[in-house]
Amino acid sequence: MSPMARKPLIAGNWKMNLDHQQAIGTVQKLAFALHKDYYEKVDVAVIVPFTDLRSVQTLVEGDKLQITYGAQDVSQHESGAYTGEVSASMLAKLNCSWVVVGHSERREYHNETDELVAAKAKAALSKGISPIVCVGEPLEIREAGTHVDYVVEQTRASLAGLSADELANTVIAYEPVWAIGTGKVASAADAQEVCKAIRGLVTELAGEEVAEGMRILYGGSVKAETIAEIVSQPDVDGGLVGGASLDGEAFAKLAANAANAV
């Protein structure tokens, strides 16, 4: 598969924002503002709080929207006495296409390890949901100049135990921790450097065909003004967007800018 065949994914991670009523309005605005022709060039997803999923599902399916949706976390367990956890089978019942695993905020605030992230990714894949596996270096690693090796090894550990077929249904998001919510943005060249190295790792793990088909996103203060240069990089296949996805019309503009750049 040539790199040109990878359709960019623009995924909006709402984090802990927007209740289920606000979610309906936001997705309606996004759908209204983004002309249907753009979906031929980019896939657009919203990654929403658990409490919003059923409302978003009802809207997307009822209005036959081309937007896809997913969750921000999943349990590694199938079911049982795990208070507060949500299983992959529950998300599958809601027709989730995606689930983010290993976001830097989960790694930092909930002490999630690479091993746990890999288990969550495998749980999602077992129910037909594509995990968006997040990796990225803190500022001190970037300043030391060891960021490429750090991220490659973090990615290797976060994909441990996944087969080539499973990796073919996995998305990776490179999100330098120092650029998340800080307004600092890695340059497009920075993003390309690391995403290319991640693709090299996937070639090693699963072969060239899987690696060439895998979508690798950049996340970290992505905005409408910066997305075009980011997705123009040969190994960057979209964006994991934070704050810029909370306004439906603004997120539509960002997605349109990405579509126009490919």
Swiss-Prot record:
Q: What is its main location?
A: cytoplasm
Q: Could you tell me what reaction this enzyme catalyses?
A: D-glyceraldehyde 3-phosphate = dihydroxyacetone phosphate
Q: InterPro entries annotated for this entry?
A: Aldolase_TIM (IPR013785), TIM_sf (IPR035990), TrioseP_Isoase_bac/euk (IPR022896), Triosephosphate_isomerase (IPR000652), Triosephosphate_isomerase_AS (IPR020861)
- Say if the entry is tagged with keyword Isomerase: yes
Q: Name one GO biological process term.
A: glyceraldehyde-3-phosphate biosynthetic process
Q: What Gene Ontology molecular function terms does this protein carry?
A: triose-phosphate isomerase activity
Task: Please tell me whether the keyword Isomerase is annotated for this protein.
Answer: yes
Q: Where does substrate bind?
A: 13-15, 181, 221, 242-243
Q: Which residues form the active site?
A: 103 (electrophile), 175 (proton acceptor)
Q: What GO terms fall under cellular component here?
A: cytosol
Q: Pfam families from the entry? A: TIM
List where in the cell it is found.
Answer: Cytoplasm
- Which keywords label this protein? Cytoplasm, Gluconeogenesis, Glycolysis, Isomerase
Mind telling me which Gene3D superfamilies this protein's record contains?
Aldolase class I (3.20.20.70)
The EC number of this protein is 5.3.1.1
Q: What class of enzyme is it?
A: isomerase
Record's subunit section: Homodimer.
* Family (UniProt): Belongs to the triosephosphate isomerase family.
Q: What does it do?
A: Involved in the gluconeogenesis. Catalyzes stereospecifically the conversion of dihydroxyacetone phosphate (DHAP) to D-glyceraldehyde-3-phosphate (G3P).
Q: What is this protein called?
A: Triosephosphate isomerase
Species this protein is from? Corynebacterium efficiens (strain DSM 44549 / YS-314 / AJ 12310 / JCM 11189 / NBRC 100395)
> What lineage does UniProt assign to this protein's organism?
Bacteria, Bacillati, Actinomycetota, Actinomycetes, Mycobacteriales
